Amino acid sequence: MTDTMFLDHLAIRLNGERAAGQKLAINWIQPDTGKRYALTVENGVFRYKADAQHVAPQVTISMPRQTLAGVLAGQTTLPAEVQAGRARVDGDAGALRTWVGLMDKFDTNFAIVTP
């Protein structure tokens, strides 16, 4: 899955009703690839811009995509990844918790074909 596909997936998971009153500016840096993204939640919508950074983000996260995917999937926690040295958080970690809390979790165990 490419970064674009991953971020588009996150945009789909964002619960627009819960996010309606939120305004978040998050910078995401992938230290293993050097890629940078400006992530924004505003008006119930998640947007991202590649090769960009917010001038005044609420929080900057530095972690590989697989680490972020694991945190968002609930397979690991951000504190565990920071403790292990696989992630770094600068700024308001509460903004990151808010963003993660705005994501819906989809049930992937459903019948595709039923009688």
Where are these regions (language model features)?
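Acidic, aliphatic-rich amphipathic alpha-helical segments
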Residues: 1-47, 93-115
